[in-house]
Every structure is written in structure tokens, then in C-alpha cells.
């Protein structure tokens, strides 16, 4: 790297720092219908299966992964 590299990089990023960043206008309304108990149970169960089942599989087979590697 040359001596001028930091100066060139500072020149490139300096102009980007002065640009205004537009803020998003996000508005939300109350839900039209409340969720029922069954819908909540299905949602929580699907999240549980999606995230915790693969992690549990990996943790339960960790010894076999260690022996293989």
C-alpha cells in the first residue's frame, strides 16, 4: 500500500458522510382481527420446530461429529 492510500480512501468516504439519509415513513394500523389461540399455538410451534429442532439435532449428535472430524 502506498502512502497516498489513506488519503484517497478518506476522500472517497468523506463525501458520503455529508449526504443526508432519508428516514423511512413507516406507519402501522391496529390489526383488523385478533389472533386466536389456535393460530398463536401454530405460530409458536412452527417457530419452535424451525429453530430449536435443528439445534437439538446438532447438539445430540455432537460426539459423532467430533469423532468424524
Swiss-Prot record:
Modifications after synthesis and translation: In response to mitochondrial stress, the precursor protein is ubiquitinated by the SIFI complex in the cytoplasm before mitochondrial import, leading to its degradation. Within the SIFI complex, UBR4 initiates ubiquitin chain that are further elongated or branched by KCMF1.
Gene3D superfamilies assigned to the protein according to its UniProt record, in alphabetical order: Cytochrome c oxidase, subunit 8 (4.10.81.10)
Chain positions of motif SIFI-degron: 2-19
A GO cellular component entry from the record: mitochondrial inner membrane
Disulphide-bridged cysteine pairs: none
Cleaved signal peptide residues: none
Pathway: Energy metabolism; oxidative phosphorylation
Compartments where located: Mitochondrion inner membrane
Membrane topology: Single-pass membrane protein
Transit peptide as UniProt keyword: yes
Entry keyword set: Membrane, Mitochondrion, Mitochondrion inner membrane, Transit peptide, Transmembrane, Transmembrane helix, Ubl conjugation
Transit peptide: 1-25
Record carries keyword GTP-binding: no
Transmembrane portions of the chain: 37-60
Main location: mitochondrion
Subunit structure: Component of the cytochrome c oxidase (complex IV, CIV), a multisubunit enzyme composed of 14 subunits. The complex is composed of a catalytic core of 3 subunits MT-CO1, MT-CO2 and MT-CO3, encoded in the mitochondrial DNA, and 11 supernumerary subunits COX4I, COX5A, COX5B, COX6A, COX6B, COX6C, COX7A, COX7B, COX7C, COX8 and NDUFA4, which are encoded in the nuclear genome.
Name the UniProt record assigns to this protein: Cytochrome c oxidase subunit 8A, mitochondrial
Species in which this protein is naturally found: Saimiri sciureus (Common squirrel monkey)
